[in-house]
Design a protein with these regions (language model features):
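Substrate-gating cap/lid alpha-helix
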Residues: 119-156
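Short, well-ordered beta-to-alpha junction loops that form the rim of enzyme active sites
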Residues: 71, 115-117, 156-158
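Conserved SGNH/GDSL esterase-like catalytic core that processes O-acyl groups on lipids
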Residues: 1-97, 133
């Protein structure tokens, strides 16, 4: 049976009354894959780089066939009108280092990067916000890095862009219907990689 490791933020694991795509992905994978994941939000790219070796200790890292990962929504977060936490060049560097770390820790695994999903800008209140322009910019950085490093990419931004507003739980998270649709797309992309042995 194939072994899959999931690394991502609250779009993966849920938050504030939402489920996230992971439970739906696990359900679709029953009988075909065993999914492993950290029991915490993996946050921004530098946080994932710092902690992924600890998360790898909780799974059979040497037997993982596919790592599905995303970092981005935490990276583009603006607080009190400031710029995103890491500037673009730092996001680029952290992704490169994260890919190298994943390849070190999961030596037999193929990698699948998920771009960050769009936000509903009008729903932000308070000092923090995200913009779709920032998300597009950082997704473009990620796609460029992954292409250079030979990592497969699933454009979840494109998948979620035309979701009905009823599938949005809040400014960034999804209802079960939205999370199920994300899981369907991830399952299809992941299965294609596993079936081709990439």
């Amino acid at each position: 049976m194939k072994q899959v490791f999931l690394l991502g933020d609250s779009i993966r694991m849920g938050n504030q009354g939402t489920t996230g795509y992971e439970p739906f992905l696990r359900q679709k994978s029953l009988g075909a894959c065993v999914c492993h994941s950290p029991q915490e939000n993996c946050q921004f790219a530098q946080y994932a780089l710092r902690h992924v070796h600890q998360w790898a200790e909780d799974c059979p890292a040497g037997e993982i066939d596919l790592v599905i990962f995303n970092c981005g929504l935490w990276d583009v977060l603006r607080m009190f009108g400031d710029d995103p936490l890491p500037p673009p060049e730092v996001y680029d560097l952290m992704l490169r280092r994260l890919v190298a770390r994943l390849r070190l820790l999961f030596p037999r695994a193929a990698l699948l990067f998920l771009t960050s999903t769009p936000t509903v800008e009008a729903r932000y209140t308070g000092p923090s916000r995200r913009t779709n322009d920032d998300i597009r910019q950082y997704n473009a950085i990620a796609r460029s890095v992954m292409e250079e490093l030979g990592v497969a990419v699933l454009d979840l931004f494109a998948v979620a862009r035309d979701f009905p507003l009823a599938w949005r739980h809040d400014h960034v998270h999804y209802t079960d219907a939205g999370s199920q649709a994300l899981a369907d797309a991830i399952f299809a992309a992941g299965t294609a990689i596993l079936n081709t042995g990439e």
